[in-house]
């Protein structure tokens, strides 16, 4: 699916995953990975922005979106440690652009968000930062 160059198709395909998620867990508190932001970062274009407008209009958005930022060096090291031939290694050089698109999306739709660089943080510290934001302490 990720190799399909038809961005209108991929935006709908992954968007339908969000529709399914929201309908299956309606009125429940959930934590997801790869929400609208990832879909938009990889498939969003000027030609398909209406797809995202409709998804946000019909589904709303999370109470908080957390973007975990990592620089190219950290991303490359993480992926190589996972698998030296990881197919995602080629995507590392696009990371800065994708993070910028994610922030743009949050700001366009006025979604509450925060960006965290976990490079120097423990998982517990990352969770603490998120919890502070959720509880209104940050």
Identify the residue ranges that each predicted region occupies.
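ATP-dependent small-molecule kinase phosphotransfer cores
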Residues: 1-53
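Active-site flanking residues adjacent to catalytic metal/cofactor-binding acidic residues
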Residues: 32-34, 68, 116
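Conserved nucleotide-binding/hydrolysis micro-motifs of P-loop NTPases
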Residues: 36-37, 70-75, 121
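A glycine- and Lys/Arg-enriched "phosphate-lid" helix/loop adjacent to the NTP-binding pocket
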Residues: 42, 47-104
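NTP-dependent small-molecule kinase module
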Residues: 77-86, 90-138
């Amino acid at each position: 699916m990720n190799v399909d160059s038809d961005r209108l198709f991929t935006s709908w395909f992954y968007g339908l995953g969000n529709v399914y998620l929201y309908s299956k867990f309606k009125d429940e508190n959930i934590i997801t990975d790869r929400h609208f932001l990832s879909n938009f970062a990889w498939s969003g274009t000027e030609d398909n922005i209406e797809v995202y407008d409709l998804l946000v209009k019909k589904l709303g958005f999370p109470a908080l979106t957390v973007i975990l930022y990592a620089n190219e060096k950290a991303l490359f090291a993480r992926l190589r440690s996972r698998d030296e031939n990881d197919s995602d290694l080629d995507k590392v050089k696009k990371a800065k652009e994708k993070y910028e698109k994610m922030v743009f999306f949050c700001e366009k739709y006025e979604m509450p968000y925060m960006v965290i660089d976990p490079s120097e943080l423990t998982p517990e510290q990352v969770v603490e930062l998120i919890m502070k934001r959720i509880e209104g302490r940050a």
